[in-house]
């Protein structure tokens, strides 16, 4: 299936051209804070499909002939490492977000412990951040929490020659197994879907943002809307949404939200997504309601409640003072922020169908 490793077929078939596009894009590195080379890949793919492409700091904007008809946004950064010294590497999202104990904005010990063993023995490769030129491959040898800096440090085999500032990406290939697409999907899968929309004749606007994993992408979007937007602007942010396991993830086709920890989303636009889901007989879940239900159970167990989550959409609504409004559409996944993140094929197919309905491409 166009370069995808396949172990089992699914009853739902995804378009071959979408799979081919995603397979290619997932092999192109886009580490948090070092996304320039991936923007170049995106520019080529989008212009080949007829889009008008413009670069701004932290955001690439692709537009058709009716740019105000529908607006989508997807972040394009993926987790990886940054060389910070001789054979020393740190988690790129922490570096890009300036999250270290030195600045009083430290990463929680709980989060570091969650990550420290996540990528043990994974294959990686280094690249030039602007051109994407290959700078060698290696293997994660060790990861530990440095007690002096209260930060997560990685040691690699085979990349001793790298200088500080060089990004290191995880080696990844798209796989199809047991009714799921598997790989480092967040968030290249929805970015590929927006590129694919232009292949189908999409004439609206798609934003591709950098540094979402470092909490910065919403700022780049807001800058654009302040400069080029109308008095009010409606946006649909697309992403993946994590669940504890694959069985839980595939209980719903798609994930919607009424709100996140930052803001309430646009009720009318959210209702439109509900109507499209119901018209296509897609099941859906409101993630905020799911978290609230899980928190009731957590309280009964004596555990700490989980946050409603902080999304790009919520952040921009909160900060824009009414300039930007909108909602989210998400693909449920398991294995979040790993190289084995799994998205049900049925959910990916449903996601593409809702996008095309929103863009009136039927």
Q: Where do the language-model regions lie?
A:
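N-terminal hydrophobic/helix-forming segments and targeting peptides
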Residues: 1-362
């Amino acid at each position: 299936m166009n370069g995808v490793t396949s172990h089992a077929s699914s009853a739902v078939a995804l378009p071959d051209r979408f799979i081919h596009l995603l397979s290619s894009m997932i092999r192109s590195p886009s580490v948090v804070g070092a996304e320039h080379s991936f923007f170049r890949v995106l520019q080529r793919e989008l212009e080949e499909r007829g889009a008008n492409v413009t670069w701004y700091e932290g955001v690439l904007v692709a537009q058709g002939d009716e740019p105000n008809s529908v607006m989508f946004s997807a972040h394009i950064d993926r987790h990886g490492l940054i060389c910070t010294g001789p054979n020393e590497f740190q988690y790129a999202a922490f570096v890009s977000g300036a999250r270290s104990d030195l600045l009083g904005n430290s990463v929680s010990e709980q989060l570091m412990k969650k990550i420290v063993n996540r990528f043990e023995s994974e294959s990686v490769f280094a690249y030039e951040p602007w051109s994407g030129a290959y700078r060698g491959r290696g293997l994660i040898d060790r990861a530990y929490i440095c007690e002096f800096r209260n930060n997560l440090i990685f040691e690699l085999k085979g990349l001793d020659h790298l200088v500080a500032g060089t990004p290191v990406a995880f080696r990844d290939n798209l796989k199809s197994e047991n009714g799921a697409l598997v790989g480092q999907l967040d968030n290249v899968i929805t970015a590929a879907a927006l590129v694919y929309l232009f292949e189908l004749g999409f004439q609206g606007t798609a934003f591709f943002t950098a540094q979402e994993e470092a909490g910065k992408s919403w700022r780049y979007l807001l800058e654009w809307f302040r400069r080029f937007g109308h008095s009010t602007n409606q946006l649909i942010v697309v992403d993946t949404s994590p669940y504890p396991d694959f069985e839980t993830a595939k209980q719903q086709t798609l994930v919607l939200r009424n709100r996140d920890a930052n803001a309430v989303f646009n009720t009318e636009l959210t209702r439109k997504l509900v109507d499209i889901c119901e018209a296509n007989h897609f099941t859906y879940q409101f993630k905020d309601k799911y978290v609230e239900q899980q928190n009731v159970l957590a309280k009964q167990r004596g555990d700490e409640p989980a946050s409603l989550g902080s999304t790009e959409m919520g952040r921009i609504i909160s900060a824009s003072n009414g300039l930007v409004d909108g909602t989210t559409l998400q693909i449920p996944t398991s294995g979040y922020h790993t190289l084995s993140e799994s998205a049900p094929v049925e959910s990916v197919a449903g996601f593409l169908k809702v996008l095309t309905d929103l863009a009136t491409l039927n």
